[in-house]
Curated annotation (Swiss-Prot):
Gene3D superfamilies per the UniProt record, alphabetical: Glycosidases, Golgi alpha-mannosidase II, Immunoglobulins
Assembly information from the UniProt record: Monomer.
Organism: Clostridium acetobutylicum (strain ATCC 824 / DSM 792 / JCM 1419 / IAM 19013 / LMG 5710 / NBRC 13948 / NRRL B-527 / VKM B-1787 / 2291 / W)
Protein name: Alpha-amylase
List of residues binding Ca(2+): 143, 184, 192, 226
Catalytic activity: Endohydrolysis of (1->4)-alpha-D-glucosidic linkages in polysaccharides containing three or more (1->4)-alpha-linked D-glucose units
């Protein structure tokens, strides 16, 4: 809540009952997004580990459940964090969009309100967000409580624990916004909490820790400027207070929380350097300058950061206050994208994308947050963490280049098409745009050249998750023993350019039985040969290239062709795999014949340990109609996570995805076929009880052991125990444990044995 919104907000309440771091700058091979609005794209992306290195989506007035539903798309769009609207109680259950301000007049300091959802809804959101590596930042209102239509009077709906008069300042409402004491000790249209009071601080600590314990990983403090400090302009003053030291210092998990405050800059009494000692701050002066620059078409004032340290601020084009008070509503979608491209490609700051509301409170807002240009900029920001910036204007100040270190650049052009010719530190090469505009730029001898289209956003950098894939083409992405694989190599950008001969140096399973094979020239620095996969291969075929003197070994990574599985997927099942290969370090083939099977292309989107190291792998359609892809399960994995995309649509198992345990050796529990609701599977057990038991009982259920059942297993000749079960409708997760005749249990050290079940 800002000063500039205060007077208008007060009238509404009565009516309703009331920095540029100079630096210059590996050429990458970007894949252009095809969809204008994306759910996921067919590229590898990985979110930053820390909130401070990523971008934040302000899911303004979205309900907790609507945010949870969109988490897969939010992660795919490159957002590391989601800011939720205030979670505290409200004095009315209205969900009318014009009553958005209700959330900024809290009746308590506890989680749950009629507009966004309950405590359990919030906790469930946080739990699911963790699976995607997404931080949940809560907008909290700690400066004041709800009024009854009269600014100084507490609303009747306010919780009884906040009706004690000693919890409030009684100094009236602020009229002199240039007086620091008035700004912090008087009201801003609502009853002003006595934040020097230990009782008020204790309540704040309890509430904020409730949020943290439920899974919140950060906070935005609304109206932080109106809560005094004991530094700067407040030091040794009668109104000085220790709210921030005591409250922030008492938070659980405090070292891992991302905290920022609304401290609107006025250049006089904002005392902003004091707040920077405790938290990050909104770059309010910069967002005004940026918005003005975008509206005028002269980007000169889009430079700088409004006098703030970019490493201590959250920057944006518009906030909810500015939108709701008509300061930014006139921005077009194109202007919003252009402003976002500048704000989010800057160094140091955490950019906040405000999602404009389109319906009642609780509804999801408009779709611009997942526009292909917005997503391209998000990914650029994530890839540029730690890189300095070099800003310059072009095209009569209608275009800006934000170059980040030596890794990449974003160009925002609000003017007509122009020919670019400017110094750069990017490496020589051709750079395709990651955004929606179809064009490319060339870097040669320290200069970037090309045509920049009118009203365009160009994003150039290297984000290829498989370095070297631009110069190697395989006839088979995975192969079985005895298969022939044709390898085509483009030496045009390598040390082997213009070589008179090129040999394929290849072997298997770490270059065992390595040998060289002469390749055939196709002209234009392209070479080709065909090999037959040996029967001795257990993991993969390895190869690199040489002319006898120079080498191309993919910067030490070499190239690999994984060994495909001999497993035959079961007809009629949407997902299948050989669960005996769920071993860290093994190749693992996933077969897919689900909702996207008739698409022209399907990619496997996968990660490990809760979606770490996410990447996409193109699948190949086999003669049985299944799409298949083979991955090497990382040695560090405990779980494998996956879903499927055709580049514009997703099959994520009705928002449940697929999650499988991985093992360090032969899995103790195997299933075949892969579990699917309403279908039969065979369960094989070879765990700690298997060898000595005279009988084994399978105890199983779905979705957290709902309606558990017991079934006797039958011992097989190979020592494993077998039971066949039919999964019920709605089953998306099969849960299992085992016990022997004496009642001894094997429940996987209280974790049970769990397999995702296809349920769509």
């Amino acid at each position: 809540m800002s000063k500039r919104s205060k007077l208008l907000k007060r009238r509404m309440l009565s009516l309703s009952v009331i920095c540029v771091l100079i630096g210059y700058g590996p050429v990458f091979n970007p894949v252009r997004s095809q969809a204008k609005v994306m759910t996921y794209s067919s590229e590898n992306r990985e979110l930053p580990e820390n909130t401070k290195d990523g971008v934040m989506l302000h899911a303004f007035d979205w309900s907790f459940n609507n945010i949870k539903k969109e988490l897969p798309s939010i992660a795919a769009a490159g957002y590391k964090a989601v800011q939720v609207s205030p979670v505290q109680g409200t004095k009315s259950n209205s969900t009318n969009s014009s009553d958005w301000w209700l959330l900024y007049q809290p009746t308590n300091q506890a989680i749950g309100n009629a507009q966004l959802g309950s405590y359990d809804d919030f906790k469930s959101l946080c739990s699911e967000a963790k699976n995607y590596g997404i931080s949940i930042v809560v907008d909290v209102v700690m400066n004041h409580m709800a009024n009854n239509g009269n600014d100084d009077e507490v609303a009747s709906e306010v919780d009884p624990s906040f009706k004690d008069p000693s919890l409030y300042h009684h100094n009236g409402q602020c009229t002199d916004w240039n007086n620091r004491q008035d700004v912090t000790q008087e009201g801003i249209g609502m009853p002003d909490l006595n934040t020097q009071s230990s009782a008020v601080q204790s309540k704040a600590i309890t509430f904020l820790n409730q949020c943290v314990d439920a899974g919140a990983t950060g906070f935005r403090f609304d109206a932080a400027k109106h809560i005094e400090t004991d530094l700067g302009l407040d030091a040794n003053k009668s109104w000085s207070g220790n709210y921030w030291e005591n409250v922030l210092g008492s938070l659980h998990n405090k070292s891992n929380l991302y905290i920022y405050g609304e401290v609107l800059q006025d250049g006089k009494v904002d005392n902003i350097s004091a707040y920077e000692s405790f938290m990050n701050v909104e770059a309010s002066a910069y967002d005004g300058s940026l918005r003005g620059a975008i509206k005028s078409g002269d980007l000169t004032n889009a430079q700088g950061m409004g006098g703030l340290d970019s490493n201590k601020c959250v920057d944006m084009l518009e906030t909810h206050d500015e939108y709701e008070h008509n300061e930014s509503k006139d921005l077009t979608d194109w202007q919003r994208k252009a402003g976002w491209a500048i704000a989010a490609s800057r160094a140091g700051s955490v950019p906040l994308f405000f999602d404009r509301p389109t319906g009642n409170i609780g509804s999801e807002g408009d779709a611009l947050w997942k526009d292909s240009d917005v997503v391209a900029v998000n990914e650029f920001h994530n890839a540029m963490a730690g890189q300095n910036e070099y800003l310059r204007l072009q095209n009569n100040n209608k275009a800006m280049i934000i170059e980040r270190g030596s890794k990449g650049a974003v160009i925002v052009n609000e003017g007509d098409s122009f020919n670019l010719n400017t110094p750069t530190n990017l490496e020589d090469g051709n750079y395709d745009n990651h955004g929606s505009a179809t064009d490319s730029l060339t870097v040669s001898q320290g200069r970037m050249t090309g045509t920049v289209p009118a009203n365009s956003i160009i994003v150039i950098y290297n984000k290829n998750s498989n370095p070297g894939s631009d110069r190697v083409t395989l006839s088979e992405q995975a192969a079985k023993a005895g298969d022939s694989v044709t390898i085509t190599y483009d030496a045009g950008t390598t040390a082997l350019k213009d070589a008179s001969n090129v040999n394929l140096y290849w072997g298997y399973d770490g270059f065992s039985a390595a040998t060289s094979k002469a390749m055939t020239s196709l002209g234009d620095n392209k070479w080709q040969t065909t090999i037959t996969v040996p029967k001795e291969v257990t993991k993969n075929v390895n190869f690199s290239f040489t002319d006898g003197t120079s080498w191309d070994n993919n910067n030490g990574a070499n190239w690999n062709i994984p060994l495909a599985s001999n497993y035959l997927p079961h007809a009629g099942y949407k997902v299948d795999y050989d669960s005996s290969n769920l071993v860290s370090g093994n190749n693992f083939t996933i077969y897919y014949n689900g909702n996207l099977a008739n698409s022209s292309n399907v990619s496997l989107h996968w990660g490990v340990n809760g979606w770490s190291n996410m990447q996409n792998l193109a699948m190949v359609k086999d003669s049985n109609g299944f799409w298949e892809a083979t991955i090497a399960i990382p040695a560090s994995s405990n779980t494998l996570n996956f879903c499927f995309t055709n580049g514009s649509s997703w099959d994520n198992n009705n928002n449940n995805n697929w999650t499988l345990n991985t093992w360090s050796s032969v899995p103790k529990v195997q299933v075949t076929p892969a579990p699917e609701a309403c279908k039969q599977i065979s369960v094989y057990y070879n765990g700690s009880l298997a060898s000595s038991a005279s009988n084994i009982t399978l105890h199983w259920g779905c979705n957290g052991f709902t309606s558990p059942q017991d079934i006797n297993m039958v011992k097989q000749a190979d020592g494993r125990w077998l039971a066949n079960i039919t999964l019920p409708s709605g089953c998306y997760n099969v849960n299992m444990a085992f016990k022997d005749q004496s009642g001894t249990w094997d429940n996987n050290n209280s974790n049970n044995y769990n397999f995702s079940s296809t349920n769509n």
